[in-house]
Structures are given as structure tokens and as C-alpha cells.
């Protein structure tokens, strides 16, 4: 049997083995290598309990016999191959299931609470244990997106966007558990599908079916903006006196030729937007101009940006998740495609604490946990939903969240190994 010379290394001090080459069978797979490392650790420490390990060669997870991986990566069998090993991530476990009255379109998790938006026209605030704390009513059509603005000792500001063409700025008094509509943000001429708050927590942007992006103040005030009503807007849906003071946008960004499906802030003065026109645009907020365009060949449904890896992830109707470097001179080149979903990818979210990991949801009813060092297959499929997955998110408390057209919000307990924590 052909042998390969390999040197094993790890960042995890307690699992380190001697830094010398070992001769191993070329056909070795994960289980074989894991057994070898455990035997070496047992020799060093008789009390060692077997651990499941994962292995990386040239920063890519081993998912096939070693020799096949080396051939795929163009690694010579004549040299000593460097193999990194990390403790295998355990599968996320479904923890809570929170029922809604209609589809769960959007989720925003924090350390303490979960905010959801639903097609039943309401938003809900949940405890991490799955208890409803507050139901927020006011929108006249389905809620499409929700997000937290800021939190202080007694209250939180939050936003909701709706098919009713408005965005609501709410104040939630956490001490008394009371909600107040502060501002009704008006100016879009179509469903508002995506909202995102900037790092200063003083501004937010929105993307709509009217093909426009708009930037708004997120700071509450006692002043009402003047808003000119368009004649084709149905008057029976106006309940502005109950919805807080009217607010109009600071600026409108025009450039997409189809609906804007997803928006985010990638820097203090930079916004990314994804559209049904097959393009992702990166905007300079100061000048209101497009800095660059990442062109696809199918509809983009969602984008997510990781400040840790400085990479953009996109999900499309062609079932693929693509990773981009928006700052590269060749920004339009896809770094990697994650291909496993069998339906439209509806939602992607980078982990807030692990630069290699992201989660995705799809019309195929599955939530998938990915590590970008394994582009060919997800780490895990989470198959809790009985219908389409519409939204995914993370909390800082180690939960993955997903909502779908089965009217359910699921939370999954997830603990990553220390070696995967991003800088």
C-alpha cells in the first residue's frame, strides 16, 4: 500500500503531538487520521479520552481519501504534507420552536432577545428560551424585515419594514414592556424588503421593490417631516396618526433596474445592495454613487458581509452561495461557490464570531451550516422545518436561528471549537 509522509499540527495546545513526519497510508480518511492522533495522544497521556477530529490540508477540510485530496489540490506525494487538525464541530441541536400565525419572514437575534417579522403583519420579541415577550402591531401588510437599532439600560429602538411600503421606528421600554411607534418612514413606492443599520446606530438604509435604496435617520425626534402623498396610494391604508411622526429619507440611491432584495453596510460610508437585476452594487454613501458592481447571471435574494473575513456572501435563485472579496481589484471574481441547496437560497448570514462560518436557508426546507474551508459540502444540514426556510440568523449567545413558511422559528444550540474563532 502506498505511503505518504505527513506532519500533523494544531493550534489547540492540549492536543499537540510531536512535530515529526509520520508515514501513513495514502488512502487514509478522516476516521483513520483521527484514530492515529488519538493513539499518539494516549501514548503521551494515559488519561486521554478519544476525541473526534477534522483535518485540513492547504486550508481545506479533508472530505475524501488523502491521496485524492492531494491530487485535487495539486500537492506532490514526494514531499511531507502538512496536515492541520481541529476538534470536530458537533452538530447544532434544535432547542426551541416558536410558533407564529403566518410565515416567519425575518429574524434579528441579540444576546438577550430574538426579534421576528411575519406575514401576519406583526413583529414579535421573544426570549432566548422561546417565550413571547411582546407582539407589535401596526403594519397593514406583511412584515418583510426587522432589525435592532440600539439598546440602553431601559429601552431599545427597533425597525420593521413591510409590504405596506413603510418602515416603522419603534421604542420598546424593556422595564415596563411597552412599545411606542416613534416614526413612520415613508417614501418608497413598493414593498420594503430589506433594512440595515449603520455602525454608528444613527442611520439606516432600506431596499425596495421600487428598485430604490434610501438612507434615513435612525435618531428619534419630536419633529415631523412633510410627506407628499401620491395619488395612486390607497388612502384606507393610512394610519399615520397611530404610527408615529412621519419621516422622509435623507437621500435616495438609484441604479438598480429591478427590485432591491437585500442591503447592508460594509463600512461606515459604504453600502452593498443586491437586486433581482442580477447585480450587487457597492455604494459610496458620501457621494451617492456606485463604486463597483459585482455581476451575476441570476437573481440575488440575499447578501451578508463578514467584518472578520471582509468577505461578502450572496444567495441566488440558482441554488448557489457565492463568496466575494468586494475590495479586490477583481471584485467581480467569485472566490468560492458553496453548492448543496436544491432550491432558491433565501437567506445567508456570516457568523458574528467565526470568520470561516456561515449559515444559509433555502426553499428546499433546509438550513445549512458551512465552513468556507469546505466549499464542496456543508458541515451540517439542519432539517427541522417542514416547509420553505425564509430567514436565518445568529445570536451572540451561540444560537443559530431560522424561520420559515411552516410558521415556525427554530433555535439551535451551537458551540464551535476554539480553534475556529476568528481574530
From Swiss-Prot:
PROSITE patterns: WD_REPEATS_1, WD_REPEATS_2, WD_REPEATS_REGION. Keywords: Nucleus, Repeat, Ribosome biogenesis, rRNA processing, WD repeat. It comes from the Eukaryota. GO terms for molecular function: ribonucleoprotein complex binding. Residues 4-87 are annotated as: Ubiquitin-like (UBL) domain. GO terms for biological process: maturation of 5.8S rRNA from tricistronic rRNA transcript (SSU-rRNA, 5.8S rRNA, LSU-rRNA); maturation of LSU-rRNA from tricistronic rRNA transcript (SSU-rRNA, 5.8S rRNA, LSU-rRNA); regulation of cell cycle. SUPFAM superfamilies: WD40 repeat-like. Its main location: nucleus. WD repeats lie at residues 99-137, 138-180, 187-226, 255-293, 295-334, 340-380, 384-422. Signal peptide: none annotated. InterPro entries: G-protein_beta_WD-40_rep, NLE, WD40/YVTN_repeat-like_dom_sf, WD40_repeat_CS, WD40_repeat_dom_sf, WD40_rpt, WDR12/Ytm1. It is found in: Nucleus, Nucleolus; Nucleus, Nucleoplasm. One of its GO terms (cellular component) is preribosome, large subunit precursor. Component of the PeBoW complex, composed of bop1, pes1 and wdr12. The complex is held together by bop1, which interacts with pes1 via its N-terminal domain and with wdr12 via a high-affinity interaction between the seven-bladed beta-propeller domains of the 2 proteins. The PeBoW complex associates with the 66S pre-ribosome. Interacts (via UBL domain) with mdn1 (via VWFA/MIDAS domain). PANTHER family: RIBOSOME BIOGENESIS PROTEIN WDR12, WD40 REPEAT PROTEIN 12, 37. Component of the PeBoW complex, which is required for maturation of 28S and 5.8S ribosomal RNAs and formation of the 60S ribosome. Belongs to the WD repeat WDR12/YTM1 family. This is Ribosome biogenesis protein wdr12.
